[in-house]
């Protein structure tokens, strides 16, 4: 999973938004709203980490089973691809 260039994560009280930046402002309309877990995964993707490392970090950060962590990662990846801010 790789994030596309031209998007930024903005954290505000109660919400996390992925917004277009630079040239993307002209073509990408709207914003992608993420929950706190998805924002955590997005930040790890910004660091260039792969899904295996993200899974380990999820297990360290949250009290979830490995299966639940994997499910959350897969859902977030799908959301980011659907939203046009990432590619597989």
Task: Locate the predicted segments by residue.
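Acidic, low-complexity/disordered tracts enriched in E/D and polar residues
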Residues: 1-46
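Long, charge-rich, low-complexity alpha-helical segments
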Residues: 30-88
């Amino acid at each position: 999973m790789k994030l596309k260039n031209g998007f930024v994560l903005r954290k505000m009280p109660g919400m996390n938004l992925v917004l277009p930046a630079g040239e993307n402002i002209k073509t990408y309309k709207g914003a992608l709203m993420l929950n706190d877990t998805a924002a955590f995964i997005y930040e790890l993707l910004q660091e260039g980490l792969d899904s295996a490392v993200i899974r380990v970090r999820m297990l360290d950060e949250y009290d979830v089973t490995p299966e639940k962590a994997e499910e959350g990662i897969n859902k977030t990846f799908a959301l980011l691809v659907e939203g046009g801010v990432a590619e597989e």
